[in-house]
Amino acid sequence: MHGVLKVRTSEEKAKAQRLKELEKIESYNKLVKSFEELREKQNGRYDEISLSVSKLVLIENPEFYTIWNYRRLAILQFTETKENSELQVIYQNEMKFLEECIQRFTKSYWIWFHRQWIALRMDNCDWEREMKLCTKLLNFDLRNFHCWGHRRFILKHSNIKLEDELKYTTEKVEQNFSNYSAWHQRSSILPKIYKEPEQLLEKILEEFELVRNAVYTEPKDSSSWIYHKWLVATIKSIPNSNYIEVLKNELTQIYDLIELEPDCKWPIYTTLLLKIEIGGFEKQELLDIISQLIKLDPDHKNYYKSLETKI
């Protein structure tokens, strides 16, 4: 009928979508073909066109690692033919391009690897900007381990204070106790900040308080329990820490949690580890805990059985 808007059927929509996808695939294949023809023609000699053509492919498919290698070879060749000022411009442009890629593909290993490679070649990488980029991305996805890895890379190669990063991880774990990456980041920087045994011991005791809040809030989440396990191993390694008394106190605290969550495996598992570490408990008592864990978590039966060798 005239004047009546035609509504597409589901079949028509699917067909239109398929045609759109085919056009995109065809366009991508043409880009790849252009790149391969250029690479063959150049025969190991690179220029700005090398970067331009390879860029078009990577914008669509950042997992094409061969092309990232190609770009690095091109840039390495430029270091032999160009002035440093020209190279710095190339590096800056590369960082801008990579940021565009990251906005679309936040978890591509090859993008992050290439970004770090470029950053180390720059005379003055803007590390603060790098950190802000990671912070921005983590606000959208707190579990993006590429961002957390990049933050560690930044801390290693810059003068950014570890204390600031510790504060950041505190904010993140308090926002979400399930943030495994934030807990892991914490474990990697604490020993670097508190280098003296006395200082580290004092901080570790504070950390037991922090993680206690976490396990009481989210007792079934593994993140904070794994961090608790790291705290136990760390305090044990500190000379004159009187760690056995600390572990006994932890054991008492976790008993209280088990009363509230009798069917939660993590506090039960942690009591087993603590009792093995403290020593002096009856073997049958520990075997009973292992049997209880196997009932609660049969998928990890073999692991729990392996703990019998430590009793």
Curated annotation (Swiss-Prot):
Q: What is its EC number?
A: 2.5.1.60
Q: What is this protein called?
A: Geranylgeranyl transferase type-2 subunit alpha
Signal peptide location: none
GO CC annotations on file = cytoplasm; Rab-protein geranylgeranyltransferase complex
Catalytic activity reads: geranylgeranyl diphosphate + L-cysteinyl-[protein] = S-geranylgeranyl-L-cysteinyl-[protein] + diphosphate
What organism is this sequence from? Answer: Dictyostelium discoideum
Describe the task this protein carries out: Catalyzes the transfer of a geranylgeranyl moiety from geranylgeranyl diphosphate to proteins with a C-terminal sequence motif -XCC or -XCXC, where both cysteines may become modified.
Entry's family note: Belongs to the protein prenyltransferase subunit alpha family.
Per-repeat ranges for PFTA: 49-82, 93-126, 129-162, 164-197, 206-239
Some GO term, biological process aspect, for this entry: which one?
protein geranylgeranylation
Summarize the subunit comment: Heterodimer of an alpha and a beta subunit.
Q: Which PANTHER family match?
A: GERANYLGERANYL TRANSFERASE TYPE-2 SUBUNIT ALPHA, PROTEIN FARNESYLTRANSFERASE ALPHA SUBUNIT/RAB GERANYLGERANYL TRANSFERASE ALPHA SUBUNIT
* PROSITE patterns reported for this sequence: PFTA
Classify the source by domain of life: Eukaryota
Instruction: Print the keywords alphabetically.
Output: Coiled coil, Prenyltransferase, Repeat, Transferase
Coiled-coil positions are 12-43
Q: Pfam families of this UniProt entry?
A: PPTA (PF01239)
Molecular function terms in GO for this entry?
Answer: Rab geranylgeranyltransferase activity; small GTPase binding
